């Protein structure tokens, strides 16, 4: 087994040149999904990987099982033997390990710079956009795997069919989620770029200027070679505005009549989608998609367009989409449970922007007709709550019962008027739903049992620790 692993690593090394004089790579904040995925690929390439984080997680446990040495505290000594230090956007410049690395003249680079280095000698496919990039990255990865191309992939969330968010393949293909939150996707030099949509988010990075954000996306697309390909959603008005500025080959997809890959006759049956795609050549492809919602049909059609343009056969594309198990925390069905007032279903979803929350609600309505939608919502970041306050009020008013948790700060300080109590007040004033504010999560199980009814669909929604709370409910309800 060890010899087989070394043989595989050598084959990859023979195909992809290594990083000169880099032996040990240290990740500060290694437990983040994006960081952990890159670390896993580098471990499998044969590099020594160390890291630090403040708490154990499924990501850190997996990396340790693969051979990484991880410290669960930050200390200057953690970087002693590092050739390079990789940091996520959440790590501040005054972090003790970052300071120590600078003092020792050890290079300190962003996560995306390391991803760009992995991509440098590969055929890179980068997926960017405000919404849908994790799922789209997973779909493209599974199509390429189904076609026997054994791609390397690095995703921001779990690719459930593969059981991991990163994989080192033995082909020239690398499929990666591109992170616009800190504009670090500008480091990437792919052959194919997908942009799913653009909406205001992470506006602190762009100095509150949406035009600056749009210019940054155009610059990202300019990183393509002149013979590269940009795949863009024709349903997004911002992308339509930007297409004339791209200056590279562009293929579009969407429900729009103008789309090159056009979706027709979408229907949802339960939690599956059925529709047709008309290709630029006029071919009609009938798709069965194993995840719900029109937003996922868009994600899947982006993946289909990439695959078709790269010469992958329909059989592999359709098989991968029909069997697609989803991405972690993207409408993740955790099971059905018997509660005091009847049977309920629990779904965990990462969506934390009003647009994402809205499409999740719509998909749930289609798949769970005539049933109540009960949402446990945890706002993520005070700044996002402030910037999108009215949109959150409008979208969250669509559910039948809303249980609101405190804002997950993600390192931010509170902002007056951008808290959960203010959200609840404004939602209540609309008169469509009367939110229940839960400030002590220890009370959540008792509250749930009091308010749930037979047949309810419970959506645990948000990017903070609401997922952990949903898993605690699963554990508690399984024992009951």
Curated annotation (Swiss-Prot):
One GO MF term attached to the UniProt entry: ATP binding
Pathway: Cell wall biogenesis; peptidoglycan biosynthesis
One Gene Ontology term from the biological process aspect of the record: cell division
Superkingdom, natural source: Bacteria
Keyword Cell wall biogenesis/degradation in record: yes
Catalytic activity entry: UDP-N-acetyl-alpha-D-muramate + L-alanine + ATP = UDP-N-acetyl-alpha-D-muramoyl-L-alanine + ADP + phosphate + H(+)
GO cellular component: cytoplasm
E.C. code: 6.3.2.8
InterPro entries: Mur-like_cat_sf, Mur_ligase_C, Mur_ligase_C_dom_sf, Mur_ligase_cen, Mur_ligase_N, MurCDEF_pg_biosynth, UDP-N-AcMur_Ala_ligase_MurC
Function: Cell wall formation.
Entry's family note: Belongs to the MurCDEF family.
Protein name per the record: UDP-N-acetylmuramate--L-alanine ligase
Organism for this UniProt entry: Mannheimia succiniciproducens (strain KCTC 0769BP / MBEL55E)
Gene name, Swiss-Prot/TrEMBL: murC
């Amino acid at each position: 087994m060890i010899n087989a692993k070394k043989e595989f690593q050598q084959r990859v090394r023979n195909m992809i040149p290594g990083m000169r004089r880099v032996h040990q790579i240290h990740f500060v904040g290694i437990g983040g999904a994006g960081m952990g995925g890159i670390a896993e690929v580098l471990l499998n390439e044969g590099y020594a990987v160390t890291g630090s984080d403040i708490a154990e997680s499924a990501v850190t446990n997996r990396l340790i099982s693969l051979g990484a040495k991880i410290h669960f505290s930050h200390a200057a000594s953690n970087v002693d033997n590092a050739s390079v230090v990789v940091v996520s956007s959440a790590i501040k410049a005054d972090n003790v390990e970052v300071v120590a690395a600078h003092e020792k003249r050890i290079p300190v680079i962003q996560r995306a710079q390391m991803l760009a280095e992995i991509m440098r000698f590969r055929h890179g496919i980068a997926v960017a956009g405000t919404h849908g990039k994790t799922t789209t990255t997973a779909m493209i990865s599974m199509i390429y795997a189904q076609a026997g191309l054994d791609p390397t992939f690095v995703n921001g969330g779990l690719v459930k069919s593969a059981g991991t968010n990163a994989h080192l393949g033995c082909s020239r293909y690398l499929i990666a989620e591109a992170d616009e939150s800190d504009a670090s996707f500008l480091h990437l030099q792919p052959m194919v770029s997908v942009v799913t949509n653009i909406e205001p988010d992470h506006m602190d990075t762009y100095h509150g200027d949406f035009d600056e954000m749009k210019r940054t996306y155009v610059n990202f697309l300019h990183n393509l070679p002149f013979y590269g390909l940009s795949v863009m959603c024709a349903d997004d008005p911002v992308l339509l505005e930007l297409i004339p500025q791209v200056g590279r080959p562009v293929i579009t997809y969407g429900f729009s009549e103008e789309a090159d890959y056009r979706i027709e006759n979408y229907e949802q049956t339960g939690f599956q989608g059925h529709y047709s795609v008309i290709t630029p050549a006029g071919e009609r492809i009938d798709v069965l998609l194993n995840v719900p919602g029109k937003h996922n049909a868009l994600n899947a059609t982006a993946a289909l367009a990439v695959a078709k343009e790269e010469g992958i056969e329909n059989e592999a594309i359709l098989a991968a989409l029909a069997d697609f198990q989803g991405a972690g925390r993207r409408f993740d069905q955790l099971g059905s449970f018997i509660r005091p007032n009847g049977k309920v279903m629990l779904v965990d979803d990462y969506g934390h922007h009003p647009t994402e929350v809205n499409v999740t609600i719509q998909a749930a309505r289609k798949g769970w007709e005539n049933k109540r939608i009960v949402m446990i919502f945890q706002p993520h970041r005070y700044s996002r709550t402030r910037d999108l306050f009215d949109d959150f009020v409008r979208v969250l008013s669509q559910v039948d019962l809303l249980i609101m948790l405190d804002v997950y700060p993600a390192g931010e300080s509170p902002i007056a008027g951008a808290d959960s109590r203010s959200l609840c007040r404004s939602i209540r004033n609309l008169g469509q739903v009367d939110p229940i504010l839960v400030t002590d999560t220890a009370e959540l199980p008792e509250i749930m049992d009091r308010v749930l009814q037979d047949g309810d669909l419970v959506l645990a929604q948000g990017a903070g620790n609401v997922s952990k709370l949903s898993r605690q409910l699963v554990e508690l309800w399984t024992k009951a």
